[in-house]
C-alpha cells in the first residue's frame, strides 16, 4: 500500500532531471529522438523512469526479468510516468565457478553499478525501477540507486523451485545447485558413480529463477526488503509465480509515487536501515557475501557502516531460519510460511528492527508490517526467538594476528567453537584443488588459499568448487579452509574468507608457511597464526606476478580496496 502524495506535492518537481531533454528549444533534437521510441506531446510533462534490467538467457536466474520489466513499465504508465527500458550485464556464478571466469564475478557488480549510472546520467532519467536475479546484479543495482540518489525501487527476479532426484539406490531427495558441486567431490572420492552424478545434474535446475537456498541472491533480495528498497513481501515468491507480476506493476507505481513525494534512495538508505538489513541477514543465516555488499552499498549511500557493525548486531540477534546450505529448507518454504515480513516482524517484536525507517512505499517499516500483518514464525522453517537454531547470528567477523583488518565466517556451519591445526598453504585455488584430488589433504589441517583477494586474484573468487569438493570427499568437518578470497552463499563446512589485509598487500597471510599452527576461536571472534610477528615478517616473500596486465581486471586490480571495506572501487 502506498502513502498518497502530500499536500506539498505541487512544490516538488517530478521531473528533476529529464526537463533538459523534453523542454525548450535546445531539447528539439532529443524530443525528436524520443518521439521515435513512442513519446508524444502528451508525455513531455511526465517523469521519465528507467527500467534497468539485468535480463539475459545465459542463466535461469534472470529469465523472468523481461516479463517483470513489462509489468514495471505498465505500473509506471498507470501512475503517470513514462518508462524507458534498458539492460545491463549479469554474470552467472554457477557457470563461472571453478575456472578463470570466476575472476570476473565480483567486478561485474561494479560494472553493473557504473553502467546504470552511465545510462541514468546520460539520458537524464528521473527515477528507476531496478530488476535483477543473479548474485552480483542485486548489490550492483542497489549501489547504483545509492550512488545516484534518485527515486528508485528494486525488484528481485525470484528463486527457482527445488529439483527432485531419484538415485540408483532408490533414494529420492530434494536437490539444489549446491548438491551438484558436492556430487562432483563425492564422485572424485569414489562415493558415487557417474550415473548418479548425471541424475543430480539433470535435476538441480527444473526451471527459471535464482538458486533456491539462502545463498547470495536470496540473501540480497531479503536485504533489499530489510533496507526498505523493495516492496515488502516481494523477495520470497518464486520466479514463475504470477504474484511477481503484481509486484512488478506495483514497483512501477511506487517509483512514480516516490518522485511525487520527493523521496530518493538516500532518504531510505540510512544507518538504521543498514542495521535492519544486518539483523535480517543474521537471523536468516545468510551469505557472507552480504558483508561485502552491504559495506559497498553503504559506501555509495555515504553511510558510515563498518565491518565491526556486523558483530555488534550479530552478537545480539539469534539465528532462527533453518535454511540451506546448512539447514533443511529453501526460499520457497520461506514464502509458504509468510516470507521475509515474518522475519522482520519477529525481529521488530524483539526490538532488533528500527520500525521508523522509511520504505519505498512511502510509509515506515512498522506501518507496512502492521498493514501486512504477516503473523509469527511457523517454528520449523522460521523458529521463534525462544527456540533459535543458534543464540547469535549466522555470520561473525573475526580478527587477530592472521587477519588484523578482519575475516568473515559463516558460523551457522561451525559445529566446533575452536579449531587449531597446521597450515597447508596454497597460492591460488587450483593448487588446493589438485592437492585434494591427489588425496594430499589431511584431517585436522588448515587449508590456506591466498592471492585470491580483490586485488591479488584479482576479483576475489568464490571458493565453492573447492569447499564443495572437500565436503563431497568426506572432509567437510575435519579441515578448516581460510582464504583472502570469498565463498559462495552455498558454501558449507568450516570456511573463513575475506581475510584482510590480503596477501598481495603483504597481509600476514602472505607470510604463512606449511606447518604453522593456526587457531580460530569463534566465541572470542579471533583468528591467529601462532608464530612470532617478527619471525613471520622476516620470512622471504616472492609474490606471484599479476595475472592480468590489460583489460577490465587489470583496471579493477588498480582501483579495488580491501574486502574489509567492501571491495569498493
UniProtKB/Swiss-Prot annotation:
Pathway(s) annotated for this protein in UniProt: Amino-acid biosynthesis; L-isoleucine biosynthesis; L-isoleucine from 2-oxobutanoate: step 3/4; Amino-acid biosynthesis; L-valine biosynthesis; L-valine from pyruvate: step 3/4
Q: How does the cofactor bind to this protein, according to its record?
A: Binds 1 [2Fe-2S] cluster per subunit. This cluster acts as a Lewis acid cofactor.
Write out the GO biological process terms: isoleucine biosynthetic process; L-valine biosynthetic process
* EC numbers: 4.2.1.9
Q: Which PROSITE patterns match?
A: ILVD_EDD_1, ILVD_EDD_2
Q: Does the keyword Iron apply?
A: yes
Question: What residue intervals traverse the membrane?
Answer: none
Q: Which cofactor does it need?
A: [2Fe-2S] cluster; Mg(2+)
Reaction equations catalysed: (2R)-2,3-dihydroxy-3-methylbutanoate = 3-methyl-2-oxobutanoate + H2O; (2R,3R)-2,3-dihydroxy-3-methylpentanoate = (S)-3-methyl-2-oxopentanoate + H2O
Positions of modified residues (N6-carboxylysine) = 136
* Binding residues annotated for [2Fe-2S] cluster, in chain numbering: 61, 134, 211
Positions bound to Mg(2+)? 93, 135-136, 462
Q: Where does the record place the catalytic residues?
A: 488
Keyword hit for Iron? yes
Quaternary assembly = Homodimer.
Question: Family per UniProt?
Answer: Belongs to the IlvD/Edd family.
Q: Report the protein's function.
A: Functions in the biosynthesis of branched-chain amino acids. Catalyzes the dehydration of (2R,3R)-2,3-dihydroxy-3-methylpentanoate (2,3-dihydroxy-3-methylvalerate) into 2-oxo-3-methylpentanoate (2-oxo-3-methylvalerate) and of (2R)-2,3-dihydroxy-3-methylbutanoate (2,3-dihydroxyisovalerate) into 2-oxo-3-methylbutanoate (2-oxoisovalerate), the penultimate precursor to L-isoleucine and L-valine, respectively.
- Which NCBIfam families does UniProt cross-reference here? ilvD (TIGR00110), PRK00911.1 (NF002068)
Name used for this protein in its record: Dihydroxy-acid dehydratase
Amino acid at each position: 500500500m502506498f502513502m498518497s502524495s502530500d499536500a506539498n506535492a505541487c512544490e516538488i518537481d517530478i521531473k528533476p532531471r529529464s526537463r533538459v531533454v523534453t523542454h525548450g528549444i535546445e531539447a528539439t533534437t532529443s524530443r525528436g529522438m524520443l518521439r521515435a521510441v513512442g513519446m508524444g506531446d502528451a508525455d513531455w510533462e511526465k517523469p521519465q523512469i528507467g527500467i534497468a534490467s539485468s535480463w539475459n538467457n545465459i542463466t535461469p536466474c534472470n529469465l523472468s526479468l523481461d516479463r517483470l520489466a513489462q509489468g514495471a513499465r505498465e505500473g509506471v504508465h498507470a501512475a503517470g510516468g513514462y518508462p524507458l527500458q534498458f539492460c545491463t550485464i549479469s554474470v552467472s556464478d554457477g557457470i563461472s565457478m571453478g575456472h578463470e571466469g570466476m575472476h570476473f564475478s565480483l567486478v561485474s557488480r561494479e560494472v553493473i553499478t557504473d553502467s546504470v549510472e552511465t545510462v541514468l546520467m546520460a539520458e537524464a532519467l528521473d527515477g528507476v525501477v531496478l530488476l535483477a536475479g543473479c548474485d552480483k546484479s542485486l548489490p550492483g543495482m542497489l549501489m547504483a540507486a545509492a550512488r545516484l540518489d534518485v527515486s528508485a525501487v528494486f525488484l528481485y527476479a525470484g528463486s527457482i523451485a527445488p529439483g527432485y532426484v531419484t538415485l540408483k539406490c532408490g533414494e529420492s531427495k530434494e536437490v539444489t545447485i549446491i548438491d551438484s558441486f558436492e556430487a562432483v567431490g563425492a564422485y572424485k572420492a569414489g562415493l558415487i558413480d557417474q550415473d548418479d552424478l548425471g541424475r543430480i545434474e539433470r535435476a538441480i535446475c527444473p526451471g527459471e529463477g535464482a538458486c533456491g537456498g539462502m545463498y547470495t541472491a536470496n540473501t540480497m533480495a531479503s536485504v533489499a526488503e530489510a533496507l526498505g528498497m523493495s516492496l515488502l513481501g516481494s523477495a520470497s515468491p518464486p520466479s514463475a509465480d504470477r504474484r511477481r507480476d503484481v509486484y512488478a506493476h506495483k514497483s512501477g507505481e511506487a517509483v512514480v509515487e516516490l518522485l511525487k513525494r520527493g523521496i530518493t534512495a538516500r532518504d531510505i538508505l540510512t544507518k538504521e536501515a543498514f542495521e535492519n538489513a544486518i539483523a535480517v541477514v543474521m537471523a536468516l543465516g545468510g551469505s557472507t557475501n552480504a558483508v561485502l555488499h552491504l559495506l559497498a552499498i553503504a559506501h555509495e549511500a555515504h553511510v558510515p557502516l563498518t565491518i565491526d557493525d556486523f558483530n555488534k548486531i550479530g552478537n545480539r540477534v539469534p539465528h532462527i531460519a533453518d535454511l540451506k546450505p546448512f539447514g533443511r529448507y529453501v526460499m520457497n518454504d520461506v514464502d509458504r510460511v509468510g516470507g521475509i515480513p515474518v522475519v522482520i516482524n519477529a525481529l521488530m517484536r524483539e526490538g532488533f528492527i528500527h520500525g521508523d525507517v522509511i520504505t519505498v512505499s512511502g510509509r515506515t517499516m512498522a506501518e507496512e508490517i502492521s498493514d501486512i500483518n504477516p503473523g509469527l514464525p511457523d517454528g520449523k522453517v522460521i523458529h521463534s526467538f525462544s527456540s533459535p537454531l543458534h543464540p547469535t547470528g549466522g555470520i561473525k567477523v573475526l580478527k587477530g594476528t592472521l587477519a588484523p583488518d578482519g575475516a568473515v565466517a559463516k558460523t551457522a556451519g561451525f559445529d566446533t567453537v575452536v579449531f587449531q591445526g597446521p597450515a597447508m598453504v596454497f597460492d591460488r585455488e587450483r593448487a588446493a584443488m589438485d592437492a585434494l584430488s591427489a588425496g594430499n589433504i589431511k584431517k585436522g589441517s588448515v587449508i590456506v588459499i591466498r592471492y585470491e583477494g580483490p586485488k591479488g586474484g584479482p576479483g576475489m573468487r568464490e571458493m565453492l568448487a573447492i569447499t564443495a569438493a572437500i565436503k563431497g570427499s568426506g572432509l567437510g568437518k575435519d579441515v578448516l579452509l581460510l582464504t583472502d578470497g570469498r565463498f559462495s552463499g552455498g558454501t558449507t563446512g568450516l570456511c573463513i574468507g575475506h581475510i584482510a589485509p590480503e596477501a598481495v598487500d603483504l597481509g600476514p597471510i602472505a607470510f604463512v608457511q606449511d606447518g604453522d599452527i593456526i587457531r580460530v576461536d569463534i566465541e572470542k571472534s579471533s583468528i591467529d597464526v601462532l608464530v612470532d610477528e617478527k619471525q613471520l615478517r622476516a620470512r622471504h616473500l616472492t609474490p606471484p606476478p599479476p595475472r592480468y596486465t590489460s583489460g577490465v581486471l587489470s583496471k579493477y586490480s588498480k582501483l579495488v580496496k580491501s574486502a574489509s571495506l567492501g571491495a569498493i572501487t
